Amino acid sequence: MDFSPFDILCCPPPLFHCFGLVLGMLAVVTHGSKIIFPGETFDPKAVLHAISDEKCTALHGVPTMFEAILGVPKPEGFDCSNLRTGIIAGAPVPRPLMKRLFGELNMTEYTSSYGTAWNAMFHVFMLTVVRPHRSFTNLLQRRHYRLH
């Protein structure tokens, strides 16, 4: 994700799961970044407000969270121009969702992974998607990392 001390992570996944705790908290602790928890429970409207009000540069969530975030009306004055990266975990990311993340949330780079609940710090699958360096055809080429 190319985090730096200047990044601000919006982390709606719960801290009682590896995603929120390991991929959320440890990402900011190891890079000196800032973390925003938009609410006690997942609320897509609260996430949109956090992205805009806190000028978040990264967003974590599962595909269904991103679908919910994209499915609610944007608040007045919504600005996601700082948002660039994040992690989408728990399931593969459908191509239509990829396009919407690029077009509607300005997420020009993100990491897709799953297997964190079983492997914590070790990912069974990871794919970093960066645009505009690759076409959508090339986006679907996956890199597999195996633990031996």
Question: Where do the language-model regions lie?
Answer:
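Residues at the C-termini of beta-strands that transition into short coil/loop
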Residues: 13, 19, 32, 39, ...
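Conserved AMP-binding/adenylation subdomain of ANL enzymes
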Residues: 1-8, 16-58, 68, 72
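Hydrophobic alpha-helical segments typical of transmembrane helices
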Residues: 11, 46-47, 65, 97, ...
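Nucleotide donor/acceptor-binding cores
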Residues: 7, 13, 84
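Hydrophobic/aromatic side chains embedded in well-ordered alpha-helices
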Residues: 8-11, 26, 109-112
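Gly/Ser/Thr-rich phosphate-binding loop
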Residues: 33, 56-61, 70-147
